[in-house]
Amino acid sequence: MNSYGYVLSGGERRRTEIARSLALDPRFMLLDEPFAGIDPIAVEEIMKIVTKLKKRNLGVLITDHNVHETLTITDRSYLLFEGRILKSGSAESLANDPEARRLYLGESFKLDRYDL
């Protein structure tokens, strides 16, 4: 590919960032807002990439406000509220927690698992 970084789409940038990080053969990765500002197809592709990284026993820490997508692919999650950890646990336990729903997720929040 002979394109400059500034001409890549948001999803292409995310995939490039992940590929560049993998070149260093890390044991752990931080993905900051990987689902922000990209189209739904790119979101699904990034979710699949993260799922594959987990299967390779690579630790992945995700910070993102797109809670639905993040909870869908995480094994353990932390909800922050007013700068503190409000709740931690599995996606299912957070999605069903009354306090997490009242203060952060919203009463109508539904957690759907994808077959990635």
What are these regions (language model features)?
Residues 4-8, 12:
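Conserved ABC ATPase signature
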Residues 18:
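Hydrophobic anchor residue at the start of the ABC signature
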Residues 25:
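Conserved catalytic motifs of ABC-family nucleotide-binding domains
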Residues 29-33:
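Catalytic Walker B motif of ABC-type/P-loop ATPase nucleotide-binding domains
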Residues 44-56:
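Helical segment within the ABC ATPase nucleotide-binding domain
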Residues 88-89:
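ABC ATPase "signature
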